A protein has these predicted regions:
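Periplasmic-binding protein-like
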Residues: 139-146, 244-264
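Ligand-binding "clamshell"
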Residues: 90-102, 117, 190, 195, ...
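Short helix-initiation/N-cap motifs at beta->coil->alpha
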Residues: 59-70, 157-186
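A bilobed periplasmic-binding-protein/Venus flytrap-type ligand-binding module shared by bacterial periplasmic
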Residues: 109-120, 222-236
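Extracytoplasmic "Venus flytrap"
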Residues: 28-46, 63-67
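A conserved helix-loop-strand patch within extracytoplasmic ligand-binding domains
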Residues: 102-152, 250
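Alpha-to-beta junction loops
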Residues: 73-83, 127, 150, 172-174, ...
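Pocket-flanking alpha-helical
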Residues: 65-96, 111-112, 118, 201-205
Length: 275
Protein backbone atom coordinates (compact mmCIF):
# COMPACT_ATOMS: atom_id res chain seq x y z
CA UNK A 1 0.00 0.00 0.00
CA UNK A 2 2.87 2.40 0.88
CA UNK A 3 4.54 1.57 -2.44
CA UNK A 4 1.34 2.35 -4.36
CA UNK A 5 0.85 5.59 -2.43
CA UNK A 6 4.44 6.64 -3.16
CA UNK A 7 3.96 5.95 -6.88
CA UNK A 8 0.75 7.97 -6.95
CA UNK A 9 2.40 10.86 -5.10
CA UNK A 10 5.31 10.87 -7.53
CA UNK A 11 2.91 10.86 -10.47
CA UNK A 12 0.93 13.68 -8.89
CA UNK A 13 4.08 15.73 -8.33
CA UNK A 14 5.14 15.20 -11.92
CA UNK A 15 1.70 16.23 -13.12
CA UNK A 16 1.68 19.35 -10.95
CA UNK A 17 5.01 20.43 -12.38
CA UNK A 18 3.92 19.61 -15.92
CA UNK A 19 0.63 21.47 -15.51
CA UNK A 20 2.35 24.60 -14.22
CA UNK A 21 4.73 24.58 -17.17
CA UNK A 22 1.89 23.87 -19.56
CA UNK A 23 -0.05 26.90 -18.33
CA UNK A 24 2.90 29.15 -19.21
CA UNK A 25 3.68 27.61 -22.57
CA UNK A 26 0.84 26.57 -24.90
CA UNK A 27 3.39 24.84 -27.13
CA UNK A 28 4.15 22.31 -24.39
CA UNK A 29 2.35 18.99 -24.71
CA UNK A 30 2.02 16.73 -21.69
CA UNK A 31 1.38 13.11 -22.65
CA UNK A 32 0.66 10.33 -20.18
CA UNK A 33 1.50 6.69 -20.74
CA UNK A 34 2.31 3.46 -18.97
CA UNK A 35 5.96 2.87 -18.16
CA UNK A 36 7.78 0.62 -20.59
CA UNK A 37 7.25 0.02 -24.30
CA UNK A 38 4.66 2.72 -24.98
CA UNK A 39 6.73 5.29 -23.12
CA UNK A 40 9.69 4.29 -25.30
CA UNK A 41 7.50 4.62 -28.39
CA UNK A 42 6.76 8.23 -27.47
CA UNK A 43 10.34 9.06 -26.51
CA UNK A 44 11.97 7.50 -29.57
CA UNK A 45 9.31 8.11 -32.20
CA UNK A 46 6.90 10.95 -31.49
CA UNK A 47 8.74 13.37 -29.20
CA UNK A 48 11.58 14.10 -31.68
CA UNK A 49 9.09 14.85 -34.47
CA UNK A 50 7.08 17.31 -32.39
CA UNK A 51 10.17 18.97 -30.97
CA UNK A 52 11.35 19.75 -34.49
CA UNK A 53 8.07 21.62 -34.92
CA UNK A 54 8.77 23.77 -31.87
CA UNK A 55 6.82 21.83 -29.25
CA UNK A 56 8.10 20.93 -25.82
CA UNK A 57 6.98 17.40 -25.02
CA UNK A 58 6.76 16.14 -21.46
CA UNK A 59 6.02 12.44 -20.92
CA UNK A 60 4.44 11.40 -17.61
CA UNK A 61 4.52 7.69 -16.74
CA UNK A 62 1.84 5.94 -14.69
CA UNK A 63 1.85 2.57 -12.95
CA UNK A 64 -1.91 2.02 -13.17
CA UNK A 65 -4.65 2.19 -15.79
CA UNK A 66 -6.98 4.50 -13.85
CA UNK A 67 -5.15 7.77 -13.24
CA UNK A 68 -4.17 8.52 -16.88
CA UNK A 69 -7.78 8.98 -17.98
CA UNK A 70 -8.73 11.07 -14.95
CA UNK A 71 -5.64 13.24 -15.47
CA UNK A 72 -6.56 13.70 -19.12
CA UNK A 73 -10.15 14.65 -18.35
CA UNK A 74 -9.04 17.09 -15.64
CA UNK A 75 -6.59 18.83 -17.98
CA UNK A 76 -3.30 17.75 -16.40
CA UNK A 77 -2.53 15.82 -19.58
CA UNK A 78 -3.12 16.76 -23.19
CA UNK A 79 -3.23 13.14 -24.38
CA UNK A 80 -2.50 9.64 -23.17
CA UNK A 81 -1.29 6.44 -24.82
CA UNK A 82 -1.84 3.13 -23.03
CA UNK A 83 -5.28 1.66 -23.80
CA UNK A 84 -7.45 0.17 -26.52
CA UNK A 85 -10.87 1.34 -27.63
CA UNK A 86 -12.80 -1.23 -25.57
CA UNK A 87 -11.17 -0.03 -22.35
CA UNK A 88 -11.45 3.67 -23.23
CA UNK A 89 -15.12 3.41 -24.17
CA UNK A 90 -16.09 1.54 -21.00
CA UNK A 91 -14.00 3.72 -18.68
CA UNK A 92 -15.22 6.98 -20.21
CA UNK A 93 -18.84 5.83 -20.14
CA UNK A 94 -18.72 4.47 -16.59
CA UNK A 95 -17.04 7.61 -15.25
CA UNK A 96 -18.77 10.14 -17.52
CA UNK A 97 -15.50 11.46 -18.94
CA UNK A 98 -15.55 13.39 -22.26
CA UNK A 99 -12.68 11.52 -23.89
CA UNK A 100 -12.21 10.38 -27.49
CA UNK A 101 -9.82 8.31 -29.56
CA UNK A 102 -7.54 10.30 -31.87
CA UNK A 103 -5.50 7.68 -33.71
CA UNK A 104 -4.29 4.10 -33.28
CA UNK A 105 -0.63 3.33 -32.56
CA UNK A 106 1.73 0.40 -33.21
CA UNK A 107 0.74 -2.27 -30.70
CA UNK A 108 2.54 -5.21 -29.17
CA UNK A 109 0.83 -8.51 -30.01
CA UNK A 110 0.52 -11.57 -27.85
CA UNK A 111 2.82 -14.27 -29.19
CA UNK A 112 3.30 -18.02 -28.84
CA UNK A 113 6.90 -18.71 -27.82
CA UNK A 114 8.79 -21.98 -27.79
CA UNK A 115 9.82 -23.48 -24.46
CA UNK A 116 10.88 -27.12 -24.55
CA UNK A 117 9.72 -27.26 -28.16
CA UNK A 118 11.36 -24.85 -30.59
CA UNK A 119 9.02 -25.04 -33.55
CA UNK A 120 5.31 -25.38 -34.21
CA UNK A 121 5.99 -28.54 -36.20
CA UNK A 122 7.25 -30.24 -33.02
CA UNK A 123 3.90 -30.04 -31.22
CA UNK A 124 3.10 -33.39 -29.63
CA UNK A 125 0.03 -34.92 -28.08
CA UNK A 126 -0.26 -33.78 -24.49
CA UNK A 127 1.97 -30.73 -24.97
CA UNK A 128 1.80 -28.18 -22.16
CA UNK A 129 0.86 -24.65 -23.16
CA UNK A 130 0.79 -21.85 -20.61
CA UNK A 131 -1.48 -18.88 -21.25
CA UNK A 132 -2.73 -15.73 -19.49
CA UNK A 133 -5.37 -16.31 -16.83
CA UNK A 134 -7.15 -12.98 -17.29
CA UNK A 135 -10.26 -13.28 -19.49
CA UNK A 136 -9.26 -10.81 -22.21
CA UNK A 137 -5.82 -12.22 -22.95
CA UNK A 138 -6.88 -15.82 -22.48
CA UNK A 139 -9.49 -15.28 -25.19
CA UNK A 140 -6.77 -13.96 -27.49
CA UNK A 141 -4.64 -17.08 -26.86
CA UNK A 142 -7.53 -19.48 -27.46
CA UNK A 143 -8.47 -17.77 -30.71
CA UNK A 144 -4.86 -18.11 -31.87
CA UNK A 145 -4.85 -21.83 -31.07
CA UNK A 146 -8.10 -22.26 -32.99
CA UNK A 147 -6.72 -20.43 -36.02
CA UNK A 148 -3.63 -22.66 -35.88
CA UNK A 149 -5.91 -25.71 -35.94
CA UNK A 150 -4.71 -27.03 -32.59
CA UNK A 151 -8.13 -26.73 -30.95
CA UNK A 152 -11.68 -26.05 -32.09
CA UNK A 153 -13.95 -23.54 -30.38
CA UNK A 154 -17.72 -23.72 -30.15
CA UNK A 155 -19.57 -22.25 -33.14
CA UNK A 156 -20.49 -18.58 -32.90
CA UNK A 157 -18.37 -18.00 -29.79
CA UNK A 158 -17.53 -14.33 -29.25
CA UNK A 159 -13.76 -14.15 -29.95
CA UNK A 160 -13.42 -11.36 -27.38
CA UNK A 161 -14.90 -13.56 -24.64
CA UNK A 162 -13.74 -17.08 -25.48
CA UNK A 163 -12.76 -19.17 -22.46
CA UNK A 164 -11.63 -22.72 -21.77
CA UNK A 165 -15.31 -23.66 -21.46
CA UNK A 166 -15.67 -22.82 -25.16
CA UNK A 167 -13.09 -25.41 -26.29
CA UNK A 168 -15.16 -27.91 -28.27
CA UNK A 169 -12.37 -30.16 -29.53
CA UNK A 170 -8.80 -30.68 -28.33
CA UNK A 171 -7.53 -33.49 -30.60
CA UNK A 172 -3.93 -33.23 -29.42
CA UNK A 173 -5.02 -33.30 -25.76
CA UNK A 174 -3.07 -30.13 -25.12
CA UNK A 175 -2.65 -29.20 -21.46
CA UNK A 176 -3.73 -25.57 -21.21
CA UNK A 177 -2.32 -23.98 -18.05
CA UNK A 178 -3.55 -20.48 -17.11
CA UNK A 179 -1.02 -18.33 -15.23
CA UNK A 180 -0.61 -14.73 -14.17
CA UNK A 181 0.65 -12.88 -17.24
CA UNK A 182 3.87 -11.78 -15.53
CA UNK A 183 4.79 -15.43 -14.82
CA UNK A 184 4.49 -16.57 -18.43
CA UNK A 185 8.07 -15.81 -19.56
CA UNK A 186 9.44 -17.89 -16.66
CA UNK A 187 7.07 -20.74 -17.51
CA UNK A 188 9.01 -21.38 -20.74
CA UNK A 189 11.56 -23.35 -18.71
CA UNK A 190 8.97 -26.06 -18.01
CA UNK A 191 6.26 -25.68 -20.65
CA UNK A 192 6.42 -26.77 -24.27
CA UNK A 193 5.00 -23.42 -25.39
CA UNK A 194 3.80 -20.23 -23.73
CA UNK A 195 1.62 -17.34 -24.80
CA UNK A 196 3.29 -14.13 -23.65
CA UNK A 197 2.04 -10.56 -23.93
CA UNK A 198 4.46 -8.23 -25.67
CA UNK A 199 5.13 -5.99 -22.68
CA UNK A 200 6.04 -8.95 -20.46
CA UNK A 201 8.15 -10.49 -23.22
CA UNK A 202 10.21 -7.29 -23.53
CA UNK A 203 10.50 -6.93 -19.76
CA UNK A 204 11.93 -10.48 -19.63
CA UNK A 205 14.53 -9.67 -22.29
CA UNK A 206 12.75 -11.61 -25.03
CA UNK A 207 12.54 -10.40 -28.61
CA UNK A 208 9.05 -10.03 -30.05
CA UNK A 209 10.42 -11.35 -33.33
CA UNK A 210 11.36 -14.67 -31.66
CA UNK A 211 7.71 -15.69 -31.30
CA UNK A 212 6.78 -18.82 -33.26
CA UNK A 213 3.35 -17.39 -34.00
CA UNK A 214 1.93 -13.90 -33.51
CA UNK A 215 -1.71 -12.87 -33.39
CA UNK A 216 -3.31 -10.61 -35.93
CA UNK A 217 -4.56 -8.07 -33.42
CA UNK A 218 -8.28 -7.39 -33.47
CA UNK A 219 -9.22 -3.76 -34.00
CA UNK A 220 -10.69 -3.92 -30.50
CA UNK A 221 -7.25 -4.46 -28.97
CA UNK A 222 -5.16 -1.96 -30.92
CA UNK A 223 -3.84 0.76 -28.62
CA UNK A 224 -4.63 4.39 -29.28
CA UNK A 225 -4.01 8.02 -28.44
CA UNK A 226 -6.82 9.45 -26.31
CA UNK A 227 -7.64 13.16 -26.06
CA UNK A 228 -10.37 15.33 -24.60
CA UNK A 229 -13.29 15.41 -27.01
CA UNK A 230 -13.38 19.22 -26.86
CA UNK A 231 -9.80 19.42 -28.18
CA UNK A 232 -10.40 17.56 -31.44
CA UNK A 233 -10.14 20.63 -33.68
CA UNK A 234 -7.14 22.24 -31.98
CA UNK A 235 -3.96 22.73 -34.06
CA UNK A 236 -1.75 20.73 -31.69
CA UNK A 237 -4.10 17.73 -32.02
CA UNK A 238 -3.69 17.84 -35.79
CA UNK A 239 0.09 18.08 -35.36
CA UNK A 240 0.09 15.11 -32.97
CA UNK A 241 -1.93 13.00 -35.40
CA UNK A 242 0.32 14.06 -38.29
CA UNK A 243 3.37 12.99 -36.29
CA UNK A 244 1.98 9.46 -36.01
CA UNK A 245 1.15 9.38 -39.72
CA UNK A 246 4.57 10.66 -40.75
CA UNK A 247 7.39 8.93 -42.61
CA UNK A 248 9.66 9.78 -39.68
CA UNK A 249 7.52 7.78 -37.25
CA UNK A 250 7.33 4.88 -39.69
CA UNK A 251 11.13 4.90 -39.85
CA UNK A 252 11.32 4.98 -36.04
CA UNK A 253 8.88 2.07 -35.85
CA UNK A 254 11.03 0.01 -38.20
CA UNK A 255 14.20 0.93 -36.29
CA UNK A 256 13.13 0.69 -32.67
CA UNK A 257 9.84 -1.21 -32.53
CA UNK A 258 10.52 -4.51 -34.27
CA UNK A 259 7.71 -6.97 -33.66
CA UNK A 260 5.02 -4.37 -33.01
CA UNK A 261 1.96 -4.66 -35.22
CA UNK A 262 1.93 -1.63 -37.47
CA UNK A 263 -1.19 0.45 -37.95
CA UNK A 264 -3.25 0.49 -41.13
CA UNK A 265 -1.99 3.96 -41.99
CA UNK A 266 1.63 2.82 -41.62
CA UNK A 267 1.04 -0.19 -43.85
CA UNK A 268 -0.60 2.07 -46.43
CA UNK A 269 2.36 4.47 -46.29
CA UNK A 270 4.82 1.60 -46.74
CA UNK A 271 2.87 0.42 -49.76
CA UNK A 272 2.98 3.92 -51.25
CA UNK A 273 6.72 4.25 -50.66
CA UNK A 274 7.40 0.96 -52.44
CA UNK A 275 5.74 2.13 -55.66
Amino acid sequence: MNHLRRNLLLAAASLAFATAAHAKDPKELVIGTSSGPYSDQLKLGIKPILEKQGYKVRIVEFNDYVQPNYALAEGSLDANVFQHIVYLTKFATDNKLPLSSLITVPTMPIGLYGGKQKSLAEVKNGATITMPNDPTNQARALVMLAKMGWIKLKPNVDPLRASERDVLENPKKLKLVPLEAAQLPRSLADADYAFVNGNFALAAGMKLTSALSVEKISDSYINLVAIRTADKAKPWVKDLEAAYRSRAFLDATNKYLAGYEKTDYQLALEKTLKK
